[in-house]
Curated annotation (Swiss-Prot):
Record's cofactor remark: Binds 1 zinc ion per subunit.
Enzyme Commission number(s): 3.4.24.-
Annotated source species: Kineococcus radiotolerans (strain ATCC BAA-149 / DSM 14245 / SRS30216)
Subcellular location as annotated: Cell membrane
Annotated PANTHER family: PROTEASE HTPX
Protein name (record): Protease HtpX homolog
Pfam families given in the database record: Peptidase_M48
Active site as annotated: 139
Length: 294
């Protein structure tokens, strides 16, 4: 039930972000005498996002200073991932470990054939084997559900909207007319558009990311057959990430949406702009999936 609802919600959110893009495009096209110039910014935004998607694995792994690990180094991690990949009838991703003690894990890569799963030293020390299995099941389902593609497309659209909005506010007066008898683009409307459109696109993008987290929780729990193991891991991660957050460096911020838990401290209004749903809600859903009653 949750799975169908989340899939529908993702589709609706994509419709919303496309709606914002079409709205801002229509407004600027009606305001400027050279609407074709906007195409340049669309191409730039899409090209930048495509590059980020194609190189997402390397970017995230470098940001976390991760290194590949052999089966001799991490036999338990290899065994769990091999068993779960076999159960899912999917390719086994490459395995990495990050030296940071901040407890977290993430998956990245273009597709199941070119994927990587990374655990930090902190999470390997924090969780027991059952909980680690739950986390790895979650990460594998991000790969197998192609959530990296989903988040990249959402990011691409948000980037295009931001580029067009910036174009409008900085060059609107130049392209909006100005000769006698010609109507000039409304500078106040352009300013509001440049502020509100990227904000709306970002909020929708983050909502898509949160929805995909719910699906990875549920699908990963079904893959392992142990929803309560992932729920237990999330409880530990909620406390662990608060005690040992990652520094808010740009490279880490750009990769944070891939991680199983929000790696930064964030309270109050900051929660609205979190790439992750509330831990309490994720845990409650997993307990409901297991038929757990308080």
């Amino acid at each position: 039930m949750h799975r169908h609802h989340n899939g529908l919600k993702t589709a609706v959110l994509f419709g919303g972000i496309w709606g914002v893009l079409l709205l801002i495009g229509a407004f600027l096209a009606s305001s400027f005498r050279s609407p074709g110039v906007l195409l340049v910014f669309v191409v730039i935004g899409l090209a930048t996002s495509a590059y980020s998607y194609w190189n997402s694995a390397g970017l995230a792994l470098r940001a976390m200073r991760a290194r590949p690990v052999s089966e001799a180094e991490q036999p338990g991690m290899h065994r769990i991932v091999r068993e779960l990949s076999t159960a899912a009838r999917q390719p086994m991703p490459q395995l990495y470990v990050s030296p940071t003690m901040a407890p977290n894990a993430f998956a990245t890569g273009r597709n199941p054939e070119n994927a990587a799963v990374c655990c930090t030293e902190g999470i390997l020390q924090l969780l027991d084997e059952r909980e680690l299995r739950g986390v790895l099941g979650h990460e594998l389902m991000h790969v197998y559900n192609r959530d990296i593609l989903t988040s990249s497309v959402a990011g691409a659209l948000a980037g295009v909207i931001t580029s067009i909005a910036q174009f409008g506010v900085f060059f609107g007066s130049a392209l909006g007319g100005g000769r006698d008898g010609e109507e000039r683009a409304n500078p106040l409307a352009l300013l509001l558009l440049s502020l509100m459109a990227p904000l709306a696109a970002s909020v929708i993008q983050l909502a898509i990311s949160r929805t995909r987290e719910y699906d990875a929780d549920e699908d990963g729990a079904r893959l392992t057959g142990d929803p309560l193991a992932l729920a237990s891991a999330l409880r530990k991660l909620e406390l662990g990430t608060r005690q040992l957050p990652l520094p808010p460096e740009r490279e880490l911020v750009n990769s944070s949406h891939m991680m199983i838990a929000n790696p930064f401290r964030g309270q109050g209004v900051a929660r609205l702009f979190s790439t992750h749903p509330p831990m309490a809600e994720r845990i409650a859903r997993l307990e409901a999936l297991a038929g757990y009653r308080r």
